[in-house]
Each structure stands twice: as C-alpha cells, then as structure tokens.
C-alpha cells in the first residue's frame, strides 16, 4: 500500500492506493485503487489496475465523488497508465487529466485547501533496470491547474534549470498562497512560492534537502504555524523560519527509528503528530520533541528465518533495518514481545545457531558483515572474509548468502567467489572462481542514480545470491548468481 486517504466528509470511506512509491530496487507492485465505505470491513476494487504505483489520493472536500489520483506508474518499463487521474462518480469511471510521456509519472499531488479547483502536480521522469537507476529526465516538472485538472500550466519561474528529478509539492493550510517544492536537481533544494506558484525562491540547499530523493522526497508544512515546515528523511527535520534553516525535530529525548517515510500533523492541535519509519509508527504530543513507539503494530519484515534443535526449539530471524532476533517457539503464557532477544544490528539477514554448539549464533547485516556470537559469554567476533593481495575487491550482495551445511557443519558465504570455513568462521578458503557473469556494465554503481548518485551495497550486482550444500553429499554445492 502506497497511500491512504480518508474522506473527511464521510470518515468511513477510505481510499487505498497500492504499490510502493519509494522506488528502491526491492519495491512491490500494486494492483490499483480500492475503496471501503464501512470503515474497512469490506474493500472494493475501483480500477487503475495497471497503475503499479499510486503515490497520492485526494478527495475533493466539497464533493466526495470527485477524487484525484497521482499515478506514479511502472518502475521497470514504459507504461501508459500514469499521470494524474480523476473520477467524478466515486470511482466508477476515471479520466486521465495530465500525462507527459511513458516514462513519467506523478510522484506528488497537492490541493489548495481553500480552493479544490487548484491543484499542483509533480511529474517525475524515472526508470530502473536490474542494474541501474535513472532519476530525472525531460519529462520531470511541476504543473498547476486552476480548473480541477482540465488544463495545466508548467511552472518554472525561479525553479532550477537543467535536468530535474523527483519533486515533492505541498500547500500550506494556514497560508494557502504559500507553496513548497522540494526539487531534486544538480543542487537539490527546497523552493517556496508566496504567489500561488507563479514565482519561486530557493529557501534551503542544505545537504538534507537532497538525501536520496527517490526514497525521501517529502515536505510537510505545519497546518497551524505558517513558518514551521517538516522534512522527513533519514531523520525528521524542522524549520521555524519558513524553510531557510532545518534542524532535528527531536530535542528532548524519546528517540525514534531512522528512515522516516510517512508523517502527519493534526490540524486541530499541531502538538500531535505521527511518524512512520523503518522501525514502525511513533507518536509525539509535543511537536516532535519527544516520541512514543506504537508497540501494538506487528509490521516488522523478515528477510530470513531459521530454527535450532533445542527443546523447545528457538526461532531466529533477520529484520529489515531492525537487526536480528531470537525467540522460543513456545512459552506457557504464549509468546510475547518480551520473549524476543536481540542478537544483531543493522538490516538483519541470515541468523542461525551452530549445529554442534547451541551457544554459538551466526548473524549478519548488509553487505556480508557476518558475526559469530556466544550467547553465554557475550563474545562477538567479526568473521567476514576479505580479499587478499592476489584478489580484487569482493562483491557482496546486500542480502549476502550465508549457509551452514547440514551434512558437513561447514560454513559458506558468497561474494563473486564462494568461500568455505571448517572452523566456524575463524578462517576461510576460497573454493571457486568468479561464478557470476562478471559483467562490468552491471558493476557501475557509482554512476547509477541519475541526477543523484545512489552508491550503496543495496545495489551491488554480479554476486552470488544463494548457496546450498547437498544434504546427502557435502562435496555437492549449489549456488545461484547473476
């Protein structure tokens, strides 16, 4: 699910847009737009089946039958079902209001709170392949309509020239003539218009304005204080001078998880706000100075799970951006949050117990960083293999395969080569040549990203991705590579 919109005139009516609009290489594809009219008891499919990613839904506050949808569209290919769509009959039929080209979708959509006929649409030209990402192109731009989407004008006065990437647009609820645009460009920055988008002034080009725009393109004016602006990103930033200077919002404790993607401030009392992060949902009752974690939402994502041979057996798993964990499979009072024990940090991936010594646990985080931990003594040892003087740099996948052979009790890890350890990771031997395609065109991560480079191990390619030792013959080993 990429976006949710509640009909403020009929709160039991909720619109859901599917598909992830934050376009990493692991995003999910949606199946269109859905609606419930009974508070979520039943949902009805309302169309846009080929949209793949819906970034925003806006219900006209003066007429609930009028709904606007920002369709970001396909990530991996051209597609025609993208742009700005509108229904005037509650979703029975749809018309496309704004379209640029097959590689450009609508990544952000905003409505003037005082005039529902005025809309701002941020169009984004982008494409991802299996080995590369391009943010930006001739299709990107910011558009405005004053007649409910029937006609559009491209806005440019004061906005950066050259190649534009992703844009986030927002209109101040307390000062509707003030419009904000977070623009990815050669020097990404926050821009502000005080004349309804006719002219723009650069407010801030702090580094945080350009941090991973495909992942953190979000700007949120406070609904009560005209000069207070929030910028979610790696952390939540706030400006109290209309967007000139940003600093961390949390100043008095109550930490929250990093990577903030969703944000809401109550228009009735702006002390109350909600923050969606890689660690779940947080709530603040003091403008973000302190935060409380909503611990009753089971929204963690496991990469891998395993079990040991204890009685009762234990379950091990690695969580997306939330470390590695261990818990018993049964408990007289049932399994509770308190039964889970943390064993590792970072993005947790493979986590499993040693077959011959149950006190030893192996866990890893991104890029092949593997550890062996002793649960009795608390000792942690970093056991990742490194290249020697005769070997080029190793290419480890974001989700590096680590395997414990059932037949041999040997440990395996894959980069572009396969490594084996017969002493629980204390030493390693390389037992293969390069098993990947070793295609240099698929190893240019430093050039990937388009307007903004995105050089992280999340995009490492031509690597070993999975390993299995035969359960019958330890000399037979299978690997999967690209």
Name the predicted role of every residue range.
Residues 1-482:
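Beta-propeller blade termini and top-face loops
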């Amino acid at each position: 699910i990429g976006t949710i919109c509640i009909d403020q005139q009929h709160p039991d009516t909720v619109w859901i847009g599917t598909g992830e609009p934050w376009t990493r290489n692991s995003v999910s594809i949606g199946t269109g737009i859905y609606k419930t009219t009974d508070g979520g008891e039943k949902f009805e499919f309302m169309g846009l089946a080929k949209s793949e990613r819906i970034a925003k839904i806006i219900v006209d506050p003066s007429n609930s039958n009028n709904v606007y949808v920002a369709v970001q569209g396909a990530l991996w290919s051209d597609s025609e079902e993208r742009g700005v769509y509108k229904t005037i009959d509650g979703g029975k039929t749809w018309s496309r209001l704004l379209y640029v080209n097959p590689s450009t979708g609508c990544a952000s959509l905003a409505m003037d709170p005082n005039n529902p006929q005025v809309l701002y649409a941020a169009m984004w030209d982008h494409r991802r392949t299996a080995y590369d990402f391009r943010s930006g192109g001739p299709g990107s731009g910011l558009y405005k309509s004053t007649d409910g989407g029937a006609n559009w004008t491209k806005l440019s006065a004061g906005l950066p020239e050259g190649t534009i990437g992703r844009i986030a647009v927002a209109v101040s609820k307390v000062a509707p003539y003030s419009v904000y645009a977070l623009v990815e460009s050669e020097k990404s920055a926050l821009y502000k218009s005080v004349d309804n988008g006719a002219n723009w002034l650069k407010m801030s080009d702090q580094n945080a304005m350009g941090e991973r725009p495909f992942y953190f393109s979000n700007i949120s004016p406070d609904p009560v204080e005209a000069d207070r602006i929030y910028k979610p990103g790696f952390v939540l930033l706030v400006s109290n001078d209309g967007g000139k200077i940003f600093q961390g919002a949390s100043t008095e404790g109550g930490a929250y998880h990093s990577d903030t993607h969703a944000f809401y401030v109550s228009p009735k009392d702006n002390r109350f706000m909600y923050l969606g992060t890689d660690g779940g949902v947080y709530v603040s009752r003091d403008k973000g100075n302190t935060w409380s974690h909503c611990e009753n939402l089971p929204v963690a994502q496991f990469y891998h799970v395993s079990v040991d041979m204890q009685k009762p057996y234990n379950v091990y798993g690695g969580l997306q951006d939330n470390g590695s964990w261990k818990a018993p499979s049964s408990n007289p009072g049932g399994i509770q949050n308190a039964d889970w024990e943390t064993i590792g940090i970072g993005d947790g991936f493979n986590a499993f117990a040693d077959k011959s010594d149950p006190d030893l646990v192996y866990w890893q985080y991104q890029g092949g960083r593997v550890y062996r931990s002793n649960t009795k003594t608390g000792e942690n040892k970093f056991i990742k293999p490194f290249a020697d003087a005769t070997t080029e740099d190793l290419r480890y996948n974001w989700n590096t395969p680590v395997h414990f052979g059932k037949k041999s009790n040997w440990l395996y890890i894959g980069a572009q080569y396969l490594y084996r350890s017969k002493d629980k990771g204390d030493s390693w031997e390389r037992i293969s040549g390069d098993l990947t395609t070793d295609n240099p065109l698929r190893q240019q991560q430093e050039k990937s990203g388009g307007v903004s480079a995105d050089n992280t191990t999340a995009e490492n390619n031509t690597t070993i991705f999975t390993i299995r030792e035969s359960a019958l013959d330890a000399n037979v080993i299978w690997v999967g590579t690209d």
